[in-house]
Amino acid sequence: MDWLMGKSKAKPNGKKPAAEEKKVYLEPEHTKSRITDFEFKELVVLPREIDLNEWLASNTTTFFHHINLQYSTISEFCTGETCQTMAVCNTQYYWYDERGKKVKCTAPQYVDFVMSSVQKLVTDEDVFPTKYGREFPSSFESLVKKICKYLFHVLGHIYWAHFKETLALELHGHLNTLYVHFILFAREFNLLDPKETAVMDDLTEVLCSSPGNSGATGDGANSGASGAQNHVKER
């Protein structure tokens, strides 16, 4: 889990400001597309008699697999040529290896780092125990927060760089549904820093403010939305 101990930074990627670029994923005809009308706000609540860490582990693993699958549908379009940086809006993400060394990489390389690292974690019995009697590590919640942060980067990149391909494949309903479920779960348990998600606040507000999801925009969903995408982020 050394990769989680390193830093992660983001900075403007040199593109024109996001406000000047048309965000196709925000068009009403696309934001209303879902594969279910289920109220995810109810689904994410911790069930009675279920241990919190068990609930976090189960859902985090599920989100990892679903986001990995969603990315795989457009992976052939996400190449070192088309996506030379891991960008979301005007924000560029860098990877830091286990030695804390800054690694500038293409989007597909970044996603591969994320997915391979998370795969190792969720299959590690010392971190994500599945056998009766095994305890979760004391740092488990912080590890889940780190995982969610990187999975959010992947979702954001799909929207920002590959929504048109997702639209052509008619998988935007799946993407929207996954995004809503993921964000509501993360907000329910404070797994994502509002400053981290500010880059996608416009989409979050539209998708998560529908009936049944009205509680999702709390916890600073709109804090920093005004001009937040033009600021350098370091984390």
From Swiss-Prot:
SMART domains found in the cross-reference section: Mob1_phocein (SM01388)
Keywords: Cytoplasm, Metal-binding, Nucleus, Phosphoprotein, Zinc
GO molecular function: metal ion binding
Subcellular location: Nucleus; Cytoplasm, Perinuclear region
Keyword Phosphoprotein: yes
Biological process, per Gene Ontology: actin cytoskeleton organization; positive regulation of neuron projection development
Residues that bind Zn(2+): 78, 83, 157, 162
InterPro entries reported in the protein's UniProt record: MOB_kinase_act_fam, MOB_kinase_act_sf
Domain of life: Eukaryota
PTM per Swiss-Prot/TrEMBL: Phosphorylated.
GO cellular component: cytoplasm; neuron projection terminus; nucleus; perinuclear region of cytoplasm
Region called Disordered, residue ranges: 1-22, 213-235
Family: Belongs to the MOB1/phocein family.
Subunit structure: Binds STK38 and STK38L.
Function: Stimulates the autophosphorylation and kinase activity of STK38 and STK38L.
UniProt name for this protein: MOB kinase activator 2
Organism per entry: Mus musculus (Mouse)
